[in-house]
Curated annotation (Swiss-Prot):
Recorded superkingdom: Viruses
Lineage, top ranks: Viruses, Varidnaviria, Bamfordvirae, Nucleocytoviricota, Megaviricetes
GO cellular component: virion component
Key words, A-Z: Virion
Name of the molecule in the record: Uncharacterized protein L550
Subcellular location as annotated: Virion
Length: 167
């Protein structure tokens, strides 16, 4: 039984009947990527004191938007998933991590790769990712409930006149 694609490979004819199936698509490979990231952080503070009453109000708002799209078309000799034995000697685009596949662990789009979950564009350590990213709530521009941005206190309701409790 032959497997076409990046699925499990084994079986017949040594090369799994998928030998160099990308050759007919030429030697070229295409890569396309577009991304967008935006950060908005607002911090406001007010401190007023009237006779015996103190009124402190702090508010911190953080809005994040990040998105990215990645497209790869691999049709070259060493690029496709089925070159040689799938996951074998010339495994490229989606091969096993041991062969440096583009979508494998450590590959361009794999775990630890530039656009993988732990990488430049990923949610962990990415420029706008939620964990460790420049715009994420954990690291960089943080949300107000963990101390706020720039050391501002956490958000709380403003106390107006009529509340006689002193801070």
């Amino acid at each position: 039984m032959a497997y076409f694609g990046c699925g499990p490979c084994g079986g017949s004819a040594g090369y799994n009947n998928c030998y160099n199936n990308g050759y007919g698509n030429g030697y070229g490979s295409n890569h396309c990527r577009d991304g967008f990231g935006a950060c908005q952080n607002n911090v406001s503070g007010r401190n007023r004191e009237v006779y015996y009453e103190k009124d402190n109000c702090f508010n911190a708002n953080n809005n994040n938007f990040y998105g990215g799209r990645e497209n790869d078309s691999c049709g070259g000799w060493n690029a496709g998933c089925n070159n040689g034995n799938c996951g074998g000697w010339n495994s490229g685009g989606c091969g096993l991590p041991f062969y440096g596949g583009g979508c494998g662990i450590g590959g361009g789009c794999g775990i630890g790769g530039g656009c993988g979950p732990i990488g430049d564009c990923g949610p962990i350590g990415g420029g706008c990712g939620p964990i460790g990213g420049g715009c994420g709530p954990v690291g960089g521009w943080r949300k107000g409930y963990k101390g706020g941005y720039g050391g501002a206190p956490s958000s709380k309701l403003c106390r107006g006149l009529g509340y006689k409790k002193r801070n």
